[in-house]
């Protein structure tokens, strides 16, 4: 891996903590996570995207809030890879329209993080099982 990874997570505190545990459990990724931050407020998200350069965004918010998060993030940083984990499969088509790198139904698992990372080879992240 060529770079450190700055991960921005958006969702509830328990879901973000669980996702961080999954990320930290992936040896090929955790050694390169330099910093992670998690948010649950859309206005704060917009401010963070102005001041900080995340490598990727994990969206864990349910329903329309998750879609709004993706929309705002893509508006600010169109090339930011977004992994969107939702409680509703119906948002899959929206994730495609918003150019998300990956969409899956919750929960966040090592397997679906692995699938998501495979779609982001340009990040230089490799996952070894």
Language-model features: locations:
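Two-component/phosphorelay signaling modules centered on CheY-like receiver
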Residues: 7-40
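Conserved phosphotransfer microenvironments
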Residues: 20, 42-46, 53-76
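A short, hydrophobic beta-strand element within the central beta-sheet of small alpha/beta folds
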Residues: 57-61, 79-89
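Alpha4-beta5-alpha5 "output face"
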Residues: 74, 93-97
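C-terminal output helix
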Residues: 108-117
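The C-terminal output helix
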Residues: 118-129
């Amino acid at each position: 891996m060529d770079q450190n990874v700055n991960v921005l997570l958006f969702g509830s505190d328990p879901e973000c903590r669980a996702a961080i545990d999954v990320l930290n459990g992936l040896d090929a990724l955790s050694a390169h996570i330099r910093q992670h931050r998690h948010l649950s407020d859309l206005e704060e998200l917009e401010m963070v995207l102005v001041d900080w350069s995340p490598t990727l965004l994990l969206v864990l918010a349910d329903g329309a809030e998750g879609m709004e998060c993706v929309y705002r993030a893509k508006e600010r940083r169109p090339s930011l890879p977004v992994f969107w984990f939702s409680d509703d499969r119906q948002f899959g088509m929206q994730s495609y329209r918003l150019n998300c790198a990956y969409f899956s139904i919750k929960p966040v698992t090592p397997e679906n993080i692995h699938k998501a990372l495979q779609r982001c080879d340009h990040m230089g992240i490799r996952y070894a099982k």
